[in-house]
Amino acid sequence: MRKATLLFLAASSLLLAASHLLAQEVEVYRTTPDLKEALHRDARLHFSAATANHRSDVVVIDVDAQERFQSIDGFGASLTDSSAWLLQEQLSSVARQEVMHKLFDPQKGIAVSFLRQPLGASDLARNHYSYEDMPQGQRDTDLVHFSIQHDEAYILPVIREALQLNPAISVMVTPWSPPGWMKTHDSMIGGQLRDDAFAAYTAYLVKSVEAYQKAGVPVKYLSVQNEPLYETKNYPGTLMQASQQKKFIRYLGPAFEKAGLDTKILAYDHNWDHPEYPEEVLSDPEASRFVAGTAFHCYGGDVAAQNEVHTRFPEKGLWMTECSGGTWQKGNLLAVTAQLIIESMRNWAQSVALWGIALDEKHGPNTGGCDTCRGFVMIDRSVTPHQVTYTEDYYAVGHASRFVHTEATRIDSSDFGREGLETVAFQNKDGSIVLIVLNNMNKDEDFAIRWNGKIARATLSGGSLATYVWK
């Protein structure tokens, strides 16, 4: 009798162990619209046989790793002149260390993995500057006075610290304007690059990338011009039509090759509403061979433009490189940013970057341009000690950047649009699966995740965002 009992217990233990193995675990991280629960780790889910616990009346999200799409570079924002200054100069060492870890550390933070860095001043800068400023009316075609010393004060130290915390960060650089003396009216504000300055500007960009890399910041991508269809009025910017951009790339591409730079060139870097711009550049055989793909912004048009360009040029990549949050946005701000991430990724983006990673209580410092933008981190300098607040953008991006690693691959997942559950899924190189789900409805939604013939049951509260991870 005792022997039979022992055999029964042993068999029961084996069955329990087998059951546990069959019930694959899913980690769950959730953020509510009011941020009362932010990247909160919920109870784990378990996959089990579909017939065992599947209700026919719930939505099913199918995840299929056999259907594979683009490789992922990362998720992040920009350490602008203003952002870097706030982080480096306006926080105590203890506070700065905490913020940097919460931004970039894969264990303690959200592991920001993509940085788009202005080359020279943008609108989110404390002053207007380039790396080759000259007195009005003077030129320096040999770039004798070239220097990135301005950036060594606080921008480069912050980028280097970010790279130490997360070496997987992809860095992109973008000029808002050439030095004023290279332009049609000798100013960084508005105007165009002169054709007779192509050689000098090419050398300037080569020197900029080389200087950054010598300073310890590898540059993976460079876009030729920020928002080339917008002629700025009160901050650095440059009008550059597609006809001029493709002509300039014919200079820049060979110069990068001659200098031994493996930095990839991106075209356009502006809104969805003019896909014909990158299509013109990519249709030029001389320019296109030097261009890795197209950078997009979100401030006009529709995300479907990314798919349009991909359909015409499937061999070229796509990047969402700027989409700021700001006071103009209303309602569920968490959902606004989550929709950007999900929809950009479902339309072939290899990255999603917002704008200034840190701003103050006045949405600056700035010298023109956006004075209503929102950062991942808002630093209130009107109180002592300065108060740090993490915004909806921080948490929305964190739902991707913390779990989707560099070189992950987007895989297929069911999606139900802005009236239901929006989803996007990835497989990391270690084999782990990441599913991001946004509940666009104002009510809790029961659903099931189906993976390799098994089902995990889940519920997501109205307006909330969740990330599900399993292996």
Question: Which residues does each PLM region occupy?
Answer:
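Bacterial N-terminal signal peptides
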Residues: 8-17
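Boundary at the C-terminal end of the N-terminal hydrophobic targeting segment
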Residues: 21-23
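N-terminal catalytic cores of secreted or lumenal carbohydrate-active enzymes
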Residues: 37-219, 250
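Conserved, mostly hydrophobic/aromatic
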Residues: 77, 111, 171, 222, ...
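Active-site neighborhood of glycoside hydrolase catalytic domains
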Residues: 199-221, 228-328
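Aromatic/acidic polysaccharide-binding cleft in carbohydrate-active enzymes
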Residues: 317-396, 412-415
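Carbohydrate-binding surface patches
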Residues: 402, 413-452, 463
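C-terminal beta-strand-rich structural cap/linker in extracellular carbohydrate-active enzymes
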Residues: 461-471
